[in-house]
Amino acid sequence: MANIVIMGAGIGGMPAAYEMRDMLPKEHTVTVVSAVDYFQFVPSNPWVAVGWRTREEIVLKVGPLLERKGIKFIAKPVTTIDAAGSKLTLSVGTPDEQMLPYAYLVITTGPKLSFDEVPGA
């Protein structure tokens, strides 16, 4: 039995989790880890800005959506990746600190923008 961990519950992580769960035998575990417990459909943000949608219409709680498909969900930030040891550390330095072993890791966290590091920006 393998534990597949997907970091990120966004526009890449959610479909990746659904596809893995559909394709893999049930004895394998699929777990999604995200620092937040919701999915925001970012391409719809302009609709909120112009009043065509509300924030509540484009933000969904992730846990129930994944668990309904047999996918585990952990709403904690990943603070370290131990690639050699095949494990993640979640919430380092807090009472909720947790180690999460994996057989396979899929990183779908998206970009972290650093506009201030671009000359002239």
Please give the residue ranges for each predicted region.
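Beta1-alpha1 glycine-rich phosphate/pyrophosphate-binding loop at the start
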Residues: 2-75, 120-121
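FAD-binding core/adjacent interface of flavoenzyme oxidoreductases
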Residues: 71-121
